[in-house]
């Protein structure tokens, strides 16, 4: 009974969104929810149906009393079949373990990204304005600028390709 009340309290949309489930995991969870809802509906319908049979009424109506006696005997001796659900429980536990593992991996990635973004934000906040930087400081921060400049100068080019088209010719001569 506790499992039934716990299952009713699950907010499936919140579970999917708060864990950030996507793709196959979200689809599996939705399929599980659908099976759960279908089973709950069937149990509700069956529990509302009457479960007693008035065999005296059938004895009065039917001429063949042997048939009624046989059916009553089978009804009284009926034992519901029990099913081994351990396989399904193992599958659910494996799904849960996989979902937890995926969530932990995602959590680790998110935390690493947050740390990286925090460092970037600190660098942005503590950085000097661009117009106050020296050429040496820019070259130290981006060594490829020095390499590109050295390459252009060694080829006899004194301006990067497309500079005049973009910024115009600034020469006075």
From Swiss-Prot:
F-type ATPases have 2 components, CF(1) - the catalytic core - and CF(0) - the membrane proton channel. In yeast, the dimeric form of ATP synthase consists of 17 polypeptides: alpha, beta, gamma, delta, epsilon, 4 (B), 5 (OSCP), 6 (A), 8, 9 (C), d, E (Tim11), f, g, h, i/j and k. Mitochondrial membrane ATP synthase (F(1)F(0) ATP synthase or Complex V) produces ATP from ADP in the presence of a proton gradient across the membrane which is generated by electron transport complexes of the respiratory chain. F-type ATPases consist of two structural domains, F(1) - containing the extramembraneous catalytic core, and F(0) - containing the membrane proton channel, linked together by a central stalk and a peripheral stalk. During catalysis, ATP synthesis in the catalytic domain of F(1) is coupled via a rotary mechanism of the central stalk subunits to proton translocation. Coiled coil: none annotated. InterPro entries: ATP_synth_F0_dsu_mt, ATP_synth_F0_dsu_sf_mt. It is a peripheral membrane protein. The keyword Transmembrane helix does not apply. It comes from Aspergillus terreus (strain NIH 2624 / FGSC A1156). This is ATP synthase subunit d, mitochondrial. One of its GO terms (molecular function) is proton transmembrane transporter activity. Residues 1-23 form a transit peptide. The keyword Mitochondrion applies. It comes from the Eukaryota.
């Amino acid at each position: 009974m506790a499992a039934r009340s716990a299952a009713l309290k699950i907010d499936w949309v919140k579970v999917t969104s708060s864990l950030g489930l996507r793709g196959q995991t979200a689809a599996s969870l939705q399929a599980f929810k659908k099976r759960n809802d279908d089973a709950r509906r069937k149990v509700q319908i069956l529990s509302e149906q009457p479960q007693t049979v008035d065999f005296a009424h059938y004895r009065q109506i039917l001429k063949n009393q042997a048939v009624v006696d046989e059916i009553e005997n089978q009804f009284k001796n009926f034992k519901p079949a029990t099913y081994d659900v351990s396989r399904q429980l193992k599958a659910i536990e494996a799904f849960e373990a996989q979902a937890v593992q995926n969530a932990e991996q995602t959590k680790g990635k998110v935390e690493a990204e947050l740390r990286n973004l925090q460092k970037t934000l600190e660098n942005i906040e503590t950085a000097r304005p661009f117009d106050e930087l020296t050429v040496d400081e820019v070259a130290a921060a981006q060594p490829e600028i020095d390499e590109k400049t050295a390459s252009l100068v060694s080829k006899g080019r004194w301006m990067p390709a497309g500079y005049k088209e973009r910024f115009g010719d600034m020469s006075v001569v």
